[in-house]
Amino acid sequence: MVATFNPAVGSHVWVEDPDEAWLDGEVVEINGDQIKVLCASGKQVVVKDSNIYPKDVEAPASGVEDMTRLAYLHEPGVLQNLQSRYDINEIYTYTGSILIAVNPFRRLPHLYSSHMMTQYKGASLGELSPHPFAVADAAYRQMVNEGVSQSILVSGESGAGKTESTKLLMRYLAFMGGRGAATEGRTVEQKVLESNPVLEAFGNAKTVKNNNSSRFGKFVEIQFDQSGRISGAAIRTYLLERSRVCQVSDPERNYHCFYMLCAAPEEDAKKFKLGDPKIYHYLNQSKCIQLDAMNDAEEYHATKKAMDVVGISSEEQDAIFRVVASILHLGNIEFAKGTEIDSSIPRDEKSWFHLKTAAELLMCNEKSLEDSLCKRIMATRDETITKTLDPEAALLSRDALAKVMYSRLFDWLVEKINTSIGQDPDSKYLIGVLDIYGFESFKTNSFEQFCINLTNEKLQQHFNQHVFKMEQEEYKKEEINWSYIEFVDNQDILDLIEKKPGGIIALLDEACMFPRSTHETFAQKLYQTYKNHKRFTKPKLARSDFTICHYAGDVTYQTELFLDKNKDYVIAEHQALLNASTCSFVANLFPPVSDDSKQSKFSSIGTRFKQQLVSLLEILNTTEPHYIRCIKPNNLLKPGIFENQNVLQQLRCGGVMEAIRISCAGYPTRKHFDEFLNRFGIIAPQVLDKNSNEPAACKKLLDKAGLEGYQIGKSKVFLRAGQMADLDTRRTEILGRSASIIQRKVRSYLAQKTFIQLRISATQIQAVCRGYLARSIYEGMRREAAALKIQRDLRKFLARKAYTELFSATILIQAGMRGMVSRKELCLRRQTKAATIIQTRCRVYLARLHYRKLKKAAITTQCAWRGKVARKELKNLKMAARETGALQEAKNKLEKQVEELTWRLQLEKRMRTDLEEAKKQENAKYESSLEEIQNKFKETEALLIKEREAAKTVSEVLPIIKEVPVVDQELMEKLTNENEKLKGMVSSLEIKIDETAKELHETARISQDRLKQALAAESKVAKLKTAMQRLEEKISDMETEKQIMLQQTILNTPVKSVAGHPPTATIKNLENGHRTNLENQFNEVEVNGNAGKSAAERQLENVDTLIDCVKENIGFSNGKPIAAFTIYKCLLHWKCFESEKTSAFDRLIEMIGSAIENEDDNGHLAYWLTNTSALLFLLQKSLKPAGAGATASKKPPITTSLFGRMALSFRSSPNLAAAAEAAALAVIRPVEAKYPALLFKQQLAAYVEKIFGMIRDNLKKELSALISMCIQAPRISKGGIQRSARSLGKDSPAIHWQSIIDGLNSLLAILKDNYVPLVLIQKIHTQTFSFVNVQLFNSLLLRKECCTFSNGEFVKSGLAELELWCGQVNEYAGPSWDELKHIRQAVGFLVIHQKYRVSYDDIVHDLCPILSVQQLYRICTLYWDDCYNTRSVSQEVISSMRALMTEESNDADSNSFLLDDNSSIPFSIDEISNSMHEKDFASVKPAKELLENPEFVFLH
């Protein structure tokens, strides 16, 4: 594969081994062309230099994703790379554009989630980790962009995972081109996917190598329209293994459908007369009946469900299963010799039972079925001869019938699926997915293996041509000089097999057409024809076998059954029998044949299969191919086992080695400039000049090394075979010399260091000795000086002691004398101070006594004068109250309260008695009482009118109560005089009580009589007007504006309804000097009544006016949206919330929907987000479901009597002002909402969520392009040369992080300008940071080049910028920083030094507690240090993670190591409500445009 290289002692090489395929070792001795190698296993071998290959010791432990990037592209390198990746569960690897898939034999659901499909959508091939999704995406993108149909060829031996890979490809293509035309409720892609279970049930079986082996080839054409959506599909099948129906070898199984039907529910089993599968001959030939990993009963239901999806009706399903059951019963029919010679009949009762059952299931005649199995009709020119069959021939006839029935059934299923899916005749492009059997070579190879290997030979030729083409395109792309590369062409093998005439298939067809031909004559014909062919040999000691030298190896075929298996015709008796079936399904499987076909019964399976291959190749040649090679790592079908010899053989059979050989024929080693310089720059350090570019540096280095034949491309260096090894040898030599120099320097340094330490130690010992002697001399001198100092200090102490005693005695005598003198002086001062205090107290007492007398006299005088002034002022105030009706002054309030108490005592006594009498009279004499009331009412009509007008005037001018004159002026004057006198008597403010006693008594009598009459009349009126009063009370409660309430109080007077006559239009002078024209007021009532006839039209116009106003940006008032407040006030006034039917809500929702059509304008969206959330808050606080307040206590009816209302007014007058103020501030009013209002609230909440999502998605879209630039740092090669292909320009890499922050700041400014609620701003930032976390973290896991030390530092610096931003806008960021926990911990792990010292517990509990085992495992295996070349974590940690992953592999909860982007709505209505307050809207002003409209006067 590569040219022989010259190894040196110490070189790491690969040597061939018969057991392990290849072993790695180190060269220990070289003797000419004999090289001794010490293998890593400890074994020493001696090999020739031509049989060893160099090993790349710097290859990453986790392997490379694309094997074309291997330093040495040869068999051991490829095998080692696949094994390294398989050990870390990386089962996919590229070889250029070819994907190699190694079957893991375990569930890896995290690799195939819908989120993973989203990640690969639009990613270029090689950008992310190898995956079938990447191949499917590349095919889809190429089809859409270039308008060329594509094909994906999936191959591999049985059990390699072809079918599963095909399912993944179809899933991804359905994901990309979904939403196609639906048929009967199911889309095309759903039917294509659901066709797999049906085809697997009838076309798959357990083999020695695979529990779910496809026993047919399948080519799925997925058709697309111009826009890239799936418009149709078609499934083509090839070479179903019909012989398996009748012959099954142990431990294999028959087709799955037989076992599923036997495991069907009891009622179905009875319908088809089936039982235990062990009793059926076609199933019990093998001991394997049950599969551990497959539940046949569940698979039966899954298959029926899939049949429903693809459009197979229940009647057709019953017919299908009847045919399957009849085949099982046919297999149990055995034959014995009949009465005639060479005849046969069913052997026993059991056989007759199964014959009868099969006939019933096929709905044909039992006798006809027996005859078709035991007899043949020979037609001659003159007569028809019936020939009987012996038991052996009858068994063959039985098996032939079973095989042809199953084959026809399978063909019908494929045709039905195609019909159900529907093909698009106008399809522009297609993507074909070919799931074909791989190369097969067994101990016994029959006709099936011959056809399978022919298929693989054809596909291998197509594959070789494609690889050669791709190789030449690579050279053209890099603009290098190249010459034609020769590759092994297998055309001679294809000519040997399919050439006409003279090919093996042609000779086989010729043998089949002669009745007397046998497999031995056929073999002899082959021997004679191809005895000199280099690809054809005859095995020794074999009479009828032959061997063909295929591209993947020699295969020996046994010809015993070649002739029988090549014949494809239906026995005439079988055709007639089944065509005559009363079951239309069975009859349609065997339609009547034409006369021409009757004359030519023979049909060759080999020829037909060859024609199918030609048709398939024609389709593939018109498409752009993509290849997936599936590899089975072991024959035990168990995970974690990698058999080198087995895998290597499959790589050869799959053509991967041939592709590598083609690559090696040209330039097998291709290195990017920076990688090449980083690795081999040490050979010529002087070429790494910062001022030179990379291509020039690479050329200088290669010239310096003396290599020839290399090529310098646009981005890569292309090396011939063996040149990489030469460079590595030179590099190893330089590193070896450098190591010697380093060792010499280190030894010199260590010796010098030892000498210096000895010298320092000797110097230190000398210094210690000298110091000891000096300290001894110094100690003697110090002791002598200390003795002298002690003597001196003792003398000084004795002298000081004598002086201190003398001094203390003197001080003591002086202190005693001074104290005696001071005590005498203190006593004198105390006596003087006491005398002064006594004098002071005496003078104060006398002065206070005089002052109190003066103050008492002054207060008495002032009280008398103030009393006089107050009485005079009281008199003036009374006069002013009668003239102006103003009773709000404080003194008048006191007077009125006293008067009210007096009147209430009298009225309650009288009203209690009168009301009891009125109730008794009303119950007994309703009619007589009504006439008496009407007569009395005529007398008091004028008085009642005036009283009610006065009462209404009192309610209008709350809390000011105005006195209204009664119609009887004389009586009113008397009442007024008597009232004044009574007030004077109660308040003790008048002195003339005795003079007015008689007048008061007379006035009280007259008032009492009139009061009885008024109360009786009003009690009846109150009962008759109960409904009207309740309606008026409800309207009065809902009206908040003073003017509207004023008008309604005047216009809705109850006098009209009682008397039946309209009130007299009078003009009166009120006491405040104003005049009221009642006639004009009633004219206004009539106008309003006429206007009420078109209230609906007026409301529609008002709604239009409102919408025209608020659909524009009318701004904010005190930080709250004007539009939302205006809409709420209008809906509240129009009573829309209580309406059972209104169009206002629909109009508003439509207006909001049209306003947010521009999804890209964040400013406009933020404005409407604020308005909708504010309006939602107002509705949340205001609307109460209907019936919620049903249990609440009702308001007592308001008394309508004059004195009752006066008494109520007096009682409530102190609190009226506060109530009015509270009503003015109460912006939000609870309302019992009907269904339209509650629906409007739900729709509004949906729009809040929608607008929130639009703003969030706009920010994500803006940041997504920047995030992709922030995940990977710019790569710098040695010598400071930056890769031009990935250069980020002269700008700092931090500019992308700054752009993200600028985007966040820009949106934050927009949200703040539009007063978006704080909770929504925080949620937007939280979900955005979560999106950043998901994108960065997933990119880290999917891109190996991102898991580096330098990249970790780059991302960490960017995250620091985001953390600084969160600190600056902490109020608005909320918990956003916590959302970056995954990428923070992952990056923190990447930048740790000495990872190999970190234990698993430290990683899980301290460094990365939030990351799962799968995520940690992937980071650890992908990590590589591009700065300091340090190691990743230890193998013990990797093993621990792998063991945990194995335990959790079947856990559905751990199905993905990627993070999902959370696009849900992260808030509730209650959170929005809690973030606002009702008082915030108290100062909001409605829209100015509406305030000028008279219809919206209620907004004032």
Curated annotation (Swiss-Prot):
One cellular component term from this protein's GO annotations in UniProt: myosin complex
Domain Dilute residue range list: 1146-1447
PANTHER family: MYOSIN, MYOSIN-8
Phenotype reported upon loss of the gene: No visible phenotype.
Protein name: Myosin-8
Keyword Lipid metabolism recorded: no
Region Actin-binding: start-end pairs: 496-530, 532-555, 590-613, 613-635
Domain IQ: 735-764, 758-787, 783-812, 806-835, 831-860, 854-883
Localisation: Cytoplasm
Any one biological process term the GO annotation gives: root hair elongation
Major localisation: cytoplasm
Domain Myosin motor: 62-732
Oligomeric and partner information: Homodimer.
Function of the molecule: Myosin heavy chain that is required for the cell cycle-regulated transport of various organelles and proteins for their segregation. Functions by binding with its tail domain to receptor proteins on organelles and exerting force with its N-terminal motor domain against actin filaments, thereby transporting its cargo along polarized actin cables.
UniProt KW keywords: Actin-binding, ATP-binding, Calmodulin-binding, Coiled coil, Cytoplasm, Motor protein, Myosin, Nucleotide-binding, Repeat
Coiled coil regions in record: 884-1049
Gene Ontology MF, one: actin filament binding
Domain note: IQ domain mediates interaction with calmodulin.
Myosin N-terminal SH3-like domain residues: 8-57
Family classification: Belongs to the TRAFAC class myosin-kinesin ATPase superfamily. Myosin family. Plant myosin class XI subfamily.
Record-linked InterPro entries: Dilute_dom (IPR002710), IQ_motif_EF-hand-BS (IPR000048), Kinesin_motor_dom_sf (IPR036961), Myosin_head_motor_dom-like (IPR001609), Myosin_N (IPR004009), Myosin_S1_N (IPR008989), MyosinXI_CBD (IPR037975), MYSc_Myo11 (IPR036018)
Cited PROSITE patterns: DILUTE, IQ, MYOSIN_MOTOR, SH3_LIKE
CDD domains: IQCD, MyosinXI_CBD, MYSc_Myo11
Residues that bind ATP: 156-163, 210-218
